[in-house]
A protein has these predicted regions:
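All-alpha prenyltransferase/terpene-synthase fold signal
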Residues: 1-286
Length: 286
């Protein structure tokens, strides 16, 4: 099941390219990349249970096809294997990075559960969750790549910043997808809205509207009355108030910040590939 839905493998690619950008790919780099991919998949499986998600990339999630118990145990099994792969790098900093990922993801999930359904959520609140739940994954993927290539402190800092900004860009694109009408993006459209999550397009729309419609939308969010009719009402409100355009602009801002972090590295195919990864994060169709 996992192998059939392996996805884009962007995360391990970031580990390998980060190592190559500041040195060379080593056997330890491959172990680090495997660890990061396993950890990423474990986090997705656990997220599906927490968020009651039953579809990903156009197919049933593990908890939908089997049970929540099987999903949790599968995620735990992957997490254990991620730790085993991390030990093969023979690097304490890599092990520390893997441990930090687990902590940041858990913090982010709790933060999201606390803030996601609040109509008064701000862009700052939103970015705090995004940094914890998505950007930190990219941050640590790039750090692990650099660590396995013996990168300097300055190189590591640039790689980590690149990963964080690219991760924010990537998540904003995902949140824009929630307003699409195409199931091919890999999850049901309006999935976040139906779960009551207030993401950047809607946050912008609420904060930049002063008429009675704004109060109506906030009341729906706070009451958690997410019927299909109300979800459509909220989606159309965000679109009409320019929420998608604003989110797209912020996404491009973070993409530019990500690419800017690579300016100190000498020109190489690996560096150009990292730039293309950042461009892909904002331009992708799925």
């Amino acid at each position: 099941y996992i192998l059939e839905g392996s996805g884009k493998l962007l995360r391990p690619m970031l580990v390998l390219l980060s190592a190559k950008t500041c040195g060379s790919v080593t056997p330890e780099t491959y172990s680090g990349a495997i660890s990061m991919e396993l950890l990423h998949n474990a986090s997705l499986i656990h997220d599906e249970v927490v968020d009651d998600t039953y579809e990903r990339r156009g197919r049933s999630s593990i908890n939908a096809r089997w049970t929540n118990k099987i999903a949790v145990l599968s995620g735990d099994y992957m997490l254990s294997n991620a730790l085993i792969s991390a030990t093969k790098t023979n690097s304490l900093p890599v092990l520390k990075a893997v441990s930090n990922i687990g902590m940041e993801l858990s913090d982010g999930e709790v933060l999201q559960l606390t803030n996601a359904r609040q109509s008064k959520s701000t862009e700052e609140d939103y970015l705090k969750v995004v940094r914890k739940k998505t950007a930190m994954l990219f941050f640590f993927f790039c750090e692990v790549g650099g660590l396995t290539a013996n990168a300097t402190e300055n190189e590591l800092e640039c790689l980590k910043n690149f990963g964080e900004y690219m991760g924010i860009c990537f998540q904003i694109k995902d949140d824009i997808f929630d307003y699409y009408q195409d199931i091919e993006i890999g999850k049901p459209t309006a999935n976040d809205l139906q779960d009551g999550k207030v993401t950047l397009p809607l946050i912008y729309a609420i904060q930049n509207s002063t008429n009675g419609k704004r109060e109506e939308i906030m009341a729906i969010i706070d009451s958690k009355d997410f019927t299909r009719v109300n979800v459509d009402l909220v989606m159309n409100f965000a679109i009409e108030k320019g929420g998608l355009e604003y989110a797209s602009k912020r996404m491009e801002d973070f993409k530019a910040l990500a690419i800017q972090q690579l300016t100190s590295f000498p020109e190489s195919e690996a560096k150009q590939a990292l730039i293309k990864c950042a461009e892909f994060a904002s331009a992708r169709k799925i």
